[in-house]
Amino acid sequence: MTREARTAVARRAATARWVRKRFGSPNFETLGFPGGDLVDTGLCDLADGKVTVESLLVSLAASRLRREGVPLSTVHADPEDRLCGLLSRSSGDLAHARYGAYLRQVSSFADACRRTRLDRRHRAP
């Protein structure tokens, strides 16, 4: 196994441990968070160094996701332009609509993380 592959495996495992510890589930999708499937896929793709719609979306929302406590080690450079380009190639005239829909999903995901974080804080002794 190459060094990069070992690093990717370690990043995925660390993310799963963090999500399990914080939310009691190994991933966001099973928690039912809106956009959780996109964020799960994006985190795995980032760990693997893949440039996908999901990894670019997570990179684009990195500052908000980090503020809500989502562990992000590395992100893609210039994610907004790269995501627009990728969507333009795959969706043509629908690229702008899909871009907006993806942003709304990741924003809803971050809102759900925030609500969960605040709920846990208020329940703590």
What are these regions (language model features)?
Residues 46-47:
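Hydrophobic/aromatic side-chain positions at a characteristic register within alpha-helices
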Residues 20-21, 65:
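A short secondary-structure junction motif
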Residues 21-33, 74-125:
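Long, low-complexity, acidic Ser/Pro- and Gly-enriched intrinsically disordered regions
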Residues 42-43, 59:
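Conserved small-residue packing positions in alpha-helical repeats and bundles
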Residues 70-71:
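Terminal alpha-helical segments
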Residues 51-67:
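TPR/TPR-like (Sel1-like) alpha-helical repeat modules
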Residues 1-19:
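Basic DNA-binding region of bZIP-type proteins
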